[in-house]
């Protein structure tokens, strides 16, 4: 690439910060980072990072530009890549499409969704039919421990591939994905791979996320205790995983036979790890249940796969979102005399 | 009855206190009450009661005798009735059979289980095969607002019937149940009925308890909000109720077609009522999930009725009990290297 890629990166948690660092220090990208809660701190002092791959004691790191809102695309300065690392909460406006809209140059900006869940590309492709939409599945362990300070303690492995979009030729999208892999890997420290089979990668990750994230959130329980109790694995986690596996199969994705046993044991036991959705509810944050529980359930339904456990998990996580929304003042539940259940 | 019945009453919450009051003031029973948390207060000052049926401002009420532990049966002073109004937590020792054992005179004491749930009689009949075991289903609204102080704000309606026991002739058990109805009603203020069909009464109440109690507990949500959200009713409460109804049917109990719609709407909407199991978990108390969720599920399984929703509710409530037990110091979950899920 002759000139540096003009990258807009939205979302500044652990994943977003480490992506900003890798892209900017690789030298093949100028990163404009859109920050929220940590905007002031990072504008003044830069990020502080302890990283298992980039080194400890990094201070004062700033990308090319730091903004506190999504900029509008300007002529001659279009963003080549718009990387989204925010939570994906489609049940709340503004949703991801709303958030990125001002920055998108139709037919040009490549939209990279570095987010969990199924069918996250659907509303993006609908809104931006002429832009390539790229799947990013990150396996990084990185946490923002206080505003602007990130502890990156597990390797940054990410898989970048193509979401099929009717109006974008596949070779254009593939080239865009491979270019993103190139600029991400330019720092020489991380392991970003081109992903030939995005549905496989996403369904594989859902085996963990749909089960452990939802059940940990409903119970506020770490995954070590689930394995200690055994019954949480036997009566909740495994039945949920088996439904996701069956839905994947019906969608043409054949996951390995031992995938559930592998995912059941994938977390270390000495850290009493709480999955991210559980961390979110404990902080009072909205939860990403629609793409992590709702979409696999709906996909299964379309394909004729019975998912009674997922339906129940969906019912509970949607009810928890209702409570979080009330606590945040986004809704004010009031009893009405003409209610459906009056 | 020539002489007064010698009644032992174990459990001193709202239900237990109002039963003590009705039995003692009716004049056909001498009640020995076994109290725990409120023993000291009530020994000194008696109970304070505001009652929708017995009157407001009752103070200093004491039954014939107040004890702080279950007494041993003494020759010539056997208890005619042992009434149990404690929570029923069979997964913890001492269980109900353990608790009442010292007071039971084999072949004589009639054991009245004024408790919720299915199959609560099974361990009692096993331990005390020669004693009549009586079912009590109470619909009272009574709450102990502070130790020894009870607000009784909804009518005391109870149904008393027979649990079949192989070694106790049915006519003996029926006579015992009817005698209990007589001494309970003697105060002239309450509505205690002989129940011809205990399975019907218990399964009917389970339609509410298995669904609303478990789901409210898992979500810490009142039933008014569930009806406001609608989706909690549609996606959780009704599916659970339908499984209980199907299980009841397989057990030979035909509940009315409209039972679910009736139970969905049975609570007032202006009180934002949290079912008792939800109140328990919010107080850090152990929960009665085995007889309210586990037994209907196991009964359904035996009868070939699929209950995927109940199985999931059971998984969650059992996991919550695990957390409550840990918080109470009853268990100390530790990861072991040779664990099943290592």
Residue ranges and their predicted role:
Chain A
Residues 1-59:
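NAD(P)+-binding Rossmann beta1-loop-alpha1 motif at the extreme N-terminus of oxidoreductases
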Residues 5, 29, 109-110, 131-132, ...:
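A structural micro-motif
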Residues 34, 52, 66-69, 136, ...:
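Conserved beta-strand termini and adjacent loop/short-helix elements that scaffold enzyme active sites
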Residues 35, 116-117, 293:
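Helix N-cap/beta->alpha junction signal
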Residues 99-104, 127-132, 145-256, 261:
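Internal alpha-helical scaffold of NAD(P)-dependent oxidoreductase catalytic cores
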Residues 2-5, 234-342:
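NAD(P)-dependent Rossmann-like dehydrogenase/reductase catalytic/cofactor-binding core
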């Amino acid at each position: 690439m002759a000139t540096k890629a003009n990258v807009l990166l939205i979302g500044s948690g652990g994943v977003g910060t480490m992506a900003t660092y890798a892209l900017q220090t690789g030298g093949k990208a100028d990163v404009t980072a859109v920050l929220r809660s940590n905007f002031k701190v990072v504008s003044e002092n830069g990020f502080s990072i302890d990283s298992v791959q980039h080194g400890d004691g990094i201070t004062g790191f700033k990308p090319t530009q730091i903004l506190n809102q999504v900029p509008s695309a300007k002529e001659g300065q279009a963003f080549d890549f718009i990387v989204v690392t925010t939570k994906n909460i489609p049940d709340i406006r503004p949703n991801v499409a709303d958030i990125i809209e001002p920055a998108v140059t139709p037919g040009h900006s490549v939209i990279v969704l570095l987010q969990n869940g199924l069918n996250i590309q659907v509303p993006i492709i609908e809104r931006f039919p002429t832009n390539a939409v790229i799947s990013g599945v990150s396996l990084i362990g990185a946490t923002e421990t206080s505003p602007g300070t990130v502890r990156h303690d597990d390797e940054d492995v990410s898989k970048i591939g193509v979401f099929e979009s009717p109006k974008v030729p596949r070779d254009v999208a593939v080239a865009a994905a491979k270019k993103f892999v190139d600029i991400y890997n330019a720092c020489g420290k991380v392991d970003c791979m081109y992903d030939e089979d995005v549905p496989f990668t996403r369904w594989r990750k859902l085996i963990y996320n749909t089960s452990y994230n939802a059940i940990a959130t409903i119970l506020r329980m770490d995954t070590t205790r689930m394995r200690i109790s055994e019954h949480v694995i036997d009566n909740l986690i495994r039945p949920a995983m088996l439904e996701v596996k069956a839905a994947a199969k019906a969608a043409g994705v054949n996951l390995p036979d031992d995938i559930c046993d592998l995912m059941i044991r994938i977390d270390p036991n000495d850290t009493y790890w709480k999955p991210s959705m559980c961390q979110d509810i404990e902080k009072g944050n909205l939860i990403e249940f629609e793409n992590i529980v709702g979409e696999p359930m709906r996909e299964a339904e379309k394909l004729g796969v019975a998912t009674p456990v997922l339906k129940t998990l969906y019912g509970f996580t949607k009810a928890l979102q209702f409570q979080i929304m009330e606590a945040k003042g986004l809704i004010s539940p009031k009893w009405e005399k003409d209610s459906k259940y009056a």
